[in-house]
A protein has these predicted regions:
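Long C-terminal interaction/binding lobes of large macromolecular proteins
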Residues: 1-252
Length: 252
């Protein structure tokens, strides 16, 4: 028995709708609330593996990072409310749902089923601090307003950077990556009676603003970003091992 093209397309549409009926409850730490999410599909898992392969073989430092972020934003019901610092805990919950509760790292089997819930109480205050809005004023009269960005800002900036620099080798892009990273955190730059909102700027304009900032601004932002990295490190630390956040998280 064969299925003609029209029937197949109809059946495929029904299959996709059937998949979308099965929601997954994802805990979003910055919201301290549950967000309904679509489950990861085989196609999306393949995209994760392909993204990691592209990152490795073509030295494209953005590829895998972009794919996992894209999946989170597409699958979660409230993408505009998800913060960058939510990315790792959301990814861990997707991994538990798709592959299972355990992952083997350096021949050690880790149970990650409750990792997010176990870690959160220890870092709750740190999370609140990094998602709050802060200001820093330099001795030259420039004030930067900054915070950990929404995930969609991280995605947009990384996507633009990938288009611009995907062919550059890793060692040639380090200085540019530094500006890309700090630009995500800056909301506004103020001086005299003027203000520049980075949230409204295109990629190239963001980079130009970062180039014009005094060194004291960048050092202050780096110290703040290190606090975000510390939170991320605690999410992936378990029993003396580091839970991988590359494609191996979803590969086995």
């Amino acid at each position: 028995m064969t299925t003609d093209t029209k029937d197949f397309d109809q059946l495929l549409g029904k299959l996709q709708k059937q998949h979308e009926k099965a929601n997954l409850d994802i805990y979003i730490p910055t919201l301290q609330d549950i967000s309904p999410s679509k489950k990861i599909t085989v196609e999306q898992q393949t995209q994760l593996l392909t993204g990691a392969l592209t990152q490795e073989t073509r030295k494209n430092v953005f590829s895998y990072n972009r794919v996992i972020t894209e999946i989170i934003l597409k699958n979660c019901s409230n993408p505009e409310e998800i913060n960058l610092v939510d990315k790792i805990p959301v990814a861990l919950q997707y991994r538990v749902d798709t592959i299972g509760d355990t992952i083997t790292v350096n021949d050690v089997t880790l149970d990650i089923s409750n990792q997010v819930n176990n870690v959160f109480p220890n870092i709750e205050q740190k999370i609140q601090h990094v998602i709050d809005t802060h200001q820093f004023e330099t001795d030259t009269g420039i004030t930067i307003t900054y915070s950990t960005p929404p995930l969609y800002i991280d995605y947009a900036v990384n996507s633009d950077a990938e288009k611009k620099w995907s062919d550059m080798q890793g060692e040639d892009i380090i200085s540019e990556l530094f500006k890309v990273e700090i630009s995500k955190y800056i909301q506004q730059v103020s001086f005299d009676s003027d203000a520049i909102s980075l949230m409204e700027l295109d990629f190239n304009s963001r980079m130009k603003v970062c180039d014009a900032l005094p060194m004291s601004c960048t050092k202050h932002l780096v110290d703040f970003i290190e606090q975000v990295k510390d939170i991320e490190n605690q999410y992936v630390s378990l029993s003396g091992q580091v839970i991988p956040m590359d494609a191996t998280l979803f590969g086995a």
